[in-house]
C-alpha cells in the first residue's frame, strides 16, 4: 500500500482490498503502518481519535463486521493527551468489536541518508509501555509496529506471552528497508520460532518520504513463504500453526535460555 495524505482515499483503498481478500476466504487482514494517513505531525493531530471512538474507527468496525473478517490496522493516531498521540495498532474482530490495541513502544527518532533525512516520531507520538497479544481464529497474535523490529527483547516477551504469530506493520524507509528489513524479520522468526508477517508501506509519499515495501510472510524456521515487491500488492498465505509446535519441540530454545534467567536472578539480589 502507498498511503497518502487523503484519509478518504486511503480508507476507500483499504475497503476495496478488504472486500477482495474476503472473497478469497481470508480470515485475517493486516494493513501497513500509517495506512489511514501518511503525513506530518499536524495532520495526525487533526484526524486523531479517542480509542474506540470516532468516525474512522466506526467505519473500520463496520467493515470488519459486514465482511466477517478480523481486521488489523497497522497504526492509527489515538489521543494520549492534549498534545501527544499514540501510534496504535488496532485489532477488530469479525463482529466489528475493537478487541485489542497496541501502542508503539519504540519511536523512530533517527537520521537516515535519504531525502527526508531526519525522523522524529517523538515530536508527535508518546511511547507505548505494554506488549500486547490477542487470541484470534488463526492463532495467538503478538503485536508490534515498524521500528520495534530492531528490539528483539520485545519479541521474546511476546513469545513468552504465547504468541505464535507476530505482526509487523511498517513503513521502513527505502534505505533502511533495503539494508535490514528481510534480515530483521527472518531473525525475529528464527529467534522466537514463530510466524512473522511483515506488512510494509511502499513507494513515494509526501515530504520526500520513500518506503521499501516488500511485505512478506515468514515461517517459524525462518523461510520466506511469500513476498511482495516495491509496489502495492496483496499477499495471501495459509498459516500452519503445527509448524510452530514442530520447530519448538525439535529445538526447544526457550527452555535452554540462560540470559533471561540470569537477569531475573540479578533483579532478585
Question: Which stretches of residues belong to each language-model region?
Answer:
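Short polar catalytic/cofactor-binding loops
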Residues: 1-5
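Cys-nucleophile CN-hydrolase/nitrilase-fold catalytic domain and related Cys-dependent amidase chemistry
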Residues: 7, 11-95, 101, 172-188, ...
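Short beta->alpha transition motifs characteristic of CBS
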Residues: 44, 90, 101-108, 216, ...
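Hydrophobic residues at beta-strand termini and immediately following loops
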Residues: 47, 102, 134, 199, ...
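CN hydrolase (nitrilase-like) catalytic-core segments centered on the catalytic cysteine
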Residues: 52-72, 140, 146-235
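Short beta-strand scaffold segments in enzyme catalytic cores
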Residues: 73-75, 88-91, 132-134, 215-217, ...
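Active-site catalytic loop in hydrolytic enzyme cores
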Residues: 81-161, 174-176, 183, 249-253
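A short C-terminal boundary segment appended to hydrolase-like catalytic domains
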Residues: 242-269
Amino acid at each position: 500500500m502507498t498511503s497518502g495524505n487523503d484519509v478518504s482515499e486511503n480508507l476507500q483503498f483499504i475497503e476495496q482490498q478488504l472486500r477482495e481478500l474476503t472473497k478469497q476466504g481470508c480470515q485475517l487482514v493486516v494493513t501497513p503502518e500509517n495506512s489511514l494517513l501518511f503525513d506530518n505531525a499536524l495532520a495526525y493531530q487533526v484526524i486523531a481519535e479517542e480509542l474506540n471512538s470516532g468516525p474512522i474507527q466506526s467505519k473500520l468496525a463496520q467493515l470488519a463486521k459486514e465482511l466477517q473478517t478480523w481486521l488489523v490496522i497497522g497504526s492509527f493516531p489515538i489521543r494520549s493527551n492534549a498534545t501527544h498521540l499514540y501510534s496504535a495498532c488496532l485489532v477488530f474482530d469479525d463482529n466489528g468489536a475493537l478487541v485489542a490495541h497496541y501502542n508503539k513502544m519504540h519511536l523512530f527518532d533517527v537520521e537516515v541518508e535519504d531525502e527526508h533525512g531526519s525522523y522524529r516520531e517523538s515530536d508527535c507520538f508518546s511511547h507505548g509501555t505494554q506488549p500486547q497479544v490477542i487470541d484470534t481464529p488463526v492463532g495467538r497474535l503478538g503485536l508490534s509496529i515498524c521500528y520495534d523490529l530492531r528490539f528483539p527483547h520485545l519479541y521474546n516477551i511476546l513469545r513468552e506471552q504465547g504468541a505464535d504469530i507476530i505482526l509487523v506493520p511498517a513503513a521502513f524507509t527505502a534505505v533502511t528497508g533495503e539494508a535490514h528489513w528481510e534480515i530483521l524479520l527472518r531473525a525475529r522468526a528464527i529467534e522466537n520460532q514463530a510466524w512473522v508477517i511483515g506488512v510494509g508501506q511502499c513507494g513515494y509519499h509526501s515530504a520526500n518520504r520513500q518506503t521499501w515495501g516488500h511485505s512478506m510472510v515468514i515461517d517459524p524456521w525462518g523461510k520466506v513463504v511469500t513476498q511482495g515487491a516495491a509496489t502495492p500488492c496483496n499477499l495471501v498465505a495459509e498459516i500452519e500453526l503445527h509448524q510452530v509446535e514442530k520447530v519448538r519441540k525439535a529445538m526447544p530454545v526457550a527452555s535452554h535460555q540462560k540470559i533471561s534467567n540470569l537477569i531475573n536472578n540479578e533483579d532478585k539480589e
